[in-house]
Amino acid sequence: LVVPDKMSREKIFHLRALGATVLLTRSDVNKGHPAYYQDYARRLADETPGAFYIDQFNNDANPLAHATSTAPELYQQLEGDIDAIVVGVGSGGTLGGLQAWFAEHSPKTEFILADPAGSILADQVDTGRYGETGSWLVEGIGEDFIPPLARLEGVHTAYRVSDREAFHTARQLLQVEGVLAGSSTGTLLSAALRYCRAQSRPKRVVTFACDSGNKYLSKMFNDDWMRQQGLIARPEQGDLSDFIALRHDEGATVTAAPDDTLAAVFTRMRLYDISQLPVLEDGRVVGIVDEWDLIRHVQGDRQRFSLPVSEAMSRHVETLDKRAPESELQAILDRGLVAVIADNTRFLGLVTRSDVLTAWRNRVAQ
């Protein structure tokens, strides 16, 4: 199965658990590039004896499934009275299939496109033309080309929805209605709400919860990930604490104690996919232990994993008060070190080069 690399790890792990071989391709290239997921999949099928390329973007069975099942189900459940249907477009099968059926059975029904900001499809609906493709984090909808199955000419109105609006709407859907849905659902619901608010009389409007939010727990429903993407933010403090990605007072920093064993520290490193931990005693940082410290002290002797962290940690810790100038932080990072940020002696968190770059990027995005 060929999958763009921006897809959530839950989707990828799920597919592998089912026995699929998952091949990741670049999501930063457009159609026609050899690393684009559709071009890669077609080439792989051509080169593999006995392979079958399903190609949902050009397979007539795709819209047919929606014309024969989704459309009549919606029509029956709403007793034949649907004013508008809000859809997203990935392969185009949902929109194309629904339009084909409703054109015959309910021609009054309008089709509304919910499109991620950065996709070209809303431009095509509005003007019949499109320019450069942008980028977006929402998964499963939005395109950098016009899917032939989509029948965009039948779309009444298109709404562009930013990642920020989509993710916040999906999170609100969970908080208010108890529905745990995926990222594209946030895009569709945002567009549906905008459409409804623009009407002058009540209408019966349909949209979809396209996927379970279980596939997005590491991304859209993870506050740390949302902050790293600049989609939610803490109040600015105007000091070095603004650069901390994982704050200790929020329980986000993984730490060690001086009397922890090296085995326990190594287990934490693997569990949280990190390479270094601050060592705390009475709320103060007394050292840092990283993978190289473990290598130097274990030296292939598994019995040495029982050594305490205090024997392996580096005691040379670069600590900055949160009120220090940014130039002092940069000087520490220039030496390839990680900076410990404190409020007087109280540990707040670590700052790495990546944390600084993320903070700077998010400032520009705002």
Model-derived regions, located:
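Active-site-proximal loop->helix
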Residues: 1-44, 117, 121-129, 146-148, ...
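Short glycine/serine/threonine-rich phosphate/pyrophosphate-binding segments
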Residues: 7-12, 88-99, 121-122, 184-192
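Active-site/ligand-binding loops adjacent to catalytic centers
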Residues: 38, 103-181, 220-244, 252-256
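Active-site/ligand-binding-proximal alpha/beta "capping" segment
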Residues: 48-92, 97-101, 149-152, 156, ...
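Glycine-rich beta-alpha junction loops
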Residues: 58-61, 90-93, 115-120, 129, ...
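Bateman (tandem CBS) regulatory domains
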Residues: 154, 238-253, 260, 305-317
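The conserved cystathionine-beta-synthase
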Residues: 254-273, 279-281, 298, 318-337, ...
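Glycine-rich acetyl-CoA-binding "A-motif" of GNAT/NAT acetyltransferases
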Residues: 285-288, 326, 347-350
